[in-house]
Regions:
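Long, helix-rich interaction regions
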Residues: 5-13, 31-46, 50-230
Length: 230
């Protein structure tokens, strides 16, 4: 496999890196780090994402993730399938960054500079109640309100279908699926910010939560099988 990584074409390198990730071959982790600086973005994506899953030292992944996310965001706009793939891979890297930072101090300045919908995705996967004020602030922006509500739900366990936390439904023209915001917000009611904020007041202590409970392997496994992802 090392020969394919060293001498293969882009598709072969990506295939080998994905194979290493899926099989959990931790012995290949040192070889993966060589490709963090690859000139090919798809190879870097596969190497960094594989290393995130394999490495027990998540702190080593924060800088490579930040650099790669930054490079994705500086790409020129892409259309069609390439544009969708770029967006999906960027979002996946942000999710991985949130998970790798979950027991560490996160790079606040970097996250604050991301597009706001990516900030929300990060906070959802960072899974810490200390970010609730930031999510509530983002929820005040109408175009972000629904996906920020989903992020709050993933941390606190609040039911996004509970009418107690939703504004009365009104007839409105559904937006065309022209942006990632529309994709994530589809089917989500408009939250009542005041009631959601009031509910969040109970989370005064900084703690890691997933759906209102401490983050443990068993709790995550219980929910990941049929849960949705932001």
């Amino acid at each position: 496999m090392i020969k394919k990584l060293d001498n293969g074409n882009i598709q072969e390198k990506v295939a080998v890196l994905d194979y290493i990730r899926k099989l959990g071959l931790q012995s290949y982790l040192p070889a993966l780090t060589v490709y963090f600086g690859s000139n090919e973005l798809s190879v870097r994506f596969s190497a960094v994402s594989a290393a995130c899953w394999l490495s027990s030292d998540k702190s080593m992944m924060i800088n490579p993730l930040c650099l790669l996310i930054d490079d994705y965001l500086t790409l020129p706009p892409l259309r069609g399938i390439e544009g969708i793939r770029k967006n999906q891979q960027t979002e996946m890297l942000v999710r991985l960054l949130g998970q790798c930072c979950s027991e560490l101090t996160y790079p606040f300045a970097f996250i604050s500079g991301l597009p706001e919908y990516l900030q929300i995705i990060f906070y959802a996967h960072y899974a810490n109640t200390k970010t609730l004020p930031l999510l509530l602030s983002l929820m005040e922006k109408e175009e972000l309100s629904r996906i920020a509500f989903v992020a709050v739900s993933l941390i606190t366990g609040i039911d996004i279908d509970d009418k107690e936390y939703l504004l009365p439904a009104k007839d409105e023209k559904l937006p065309e699926i022209t942006s990632r915001l529309n994709v994530f917000g589809t089917g989500i009611g408009m939250p009542d910010i005041h009631k959601v904020t009031s509910m969040c007041q109970q989370y005064r202590n900084e703690e890691r939560l997933f759906l209102g409970k401490s983050v443990t392997a068993s709790w995550c496994n219980t929910n990941f099988s049929d849960g949705s992802q932001l």
